[in-house]
Swiss-Prot record:
Disulfide bonds: 59-65
Keyword Signal annotated: yes
Keyword Secreted annotated: yes
Protein name in UniProt: Gaegurin-5
Residues cleaved off as propeptide: 23-39
GO cellular component, as recorded: extracellular region
Organism per entry: Glandirana rugosa
Main location: secreted
Encoding gene per record: GGN5
Length: 65
């Protein structure tokens, strides 16, 4: 009987550890997704600014306006 309790306790402990590791991995994946979304938003804003500034810079450099 003691051996059965011991093995069940061991299984419960290992299952708990496994579950906590899965949750940590899931949280790490969610953080990476948020980082990618922020990068996409930053690049979009950068392209908008560049599209407004580059023509005037090109005009000033080549002096063909």
């Amino acid at each position: 009987m003691f051996t059965l309790k011991k093995s069940l306790l061991l299984l419960f402990f290992l299952g708990t550890i496994s579950l906590s590791l899965c949750e940590e991995e899931r949280n790490a994946d969610e953080e990476e997704k948020r980082d990618v979304e922020v990068e996409k938003r930053f690049l979009g804003a950068l392209f908008k600014v560049a599209s407004k500034v580059l023509p005037s810079v090109f005009c000033a450099i080549t002096k063909k306006c």
